[in-house]
A protein has these predicted regions:
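Glycine-rich phosphate-binding active-site loops on the catalytic face of alpha/beta enzymes
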Residues: 71-83, 113-130, 147-149
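Conserved N-terminal beta1-alpha1 strand-loop-helix module at the mouth
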Residues: 1-80, 85-112, 140
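Glycine-rich adenosine-cofactor-binding loop
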Residues: 95-99, 110, 128-149
Length: 149
């Protein structure tokens, strides 16, 4: 499982050329309603040559159809529908949460990793270091603060 993740919203060859293969890429674009499969396949094929893991956000069916490494479920995604799907053994589900309620939802969604954000004061979901540490202790899932083995 990668330890670093980088979010992108489009295919930028120059940016992706400089990505280390220890960093996973998450494709997330809030500006569009429907993902362009051709663009996603372009990114996937490019990253495959670099041996970089590739995830898309909030669309498990498309991630499975395009044989991606996994899916990222954002904090507002509360759907449990994917639990009925038959997933490949190496398919990863990762997610993000801003509070304890969202952490519990991510646990119900069977995420393997939960991003707990935001630590620093740059948006309304700001936690701060102490609250971040406290919330991190409420889950046994891997998170960006503590890893369980």
């Amino acid at each position: 499982m990668p330890k670093k993740y980088h979010f992108i919203s489009s295919f930028d060859r120059d940016l992706l050329n400089n990505i280390d293969n220890k960093i996973a890429i998450i494709y997330r674009n809030h500006q569009i309603k429907k993902y362009d499969s051709i663009e996603i396949l372009k990114i996937k094929n490019f990253l495959k040559t670099k041996k970089v893991k590739f995830f898309i956000s909030n669309n498990i069916k498309l991630a499975m159809k395009l044989d991606l490494d996994g899916v990222y479920l954002s904090s507002f995604n509360k759907s449990l529908a994917h639990l009925a799907f038959s997933l490949k053994k190496k398919f990863m589900i990762i997610g993000s949460a801003h509070n304890l309620k969202q952490i519990r939802i991510k646990e119900l969604q069977n995420t393997q990793l939960i991003f707990i954000s935001s630590i620093f004061k740059k948006n309304k979901n700001y936690l701060g270091i102490n609250k971040f540490k406290l919330i991190s202790n409420y889950t046994k899932k891997n998170n960006c603060f503590r890893r369980n083995k």
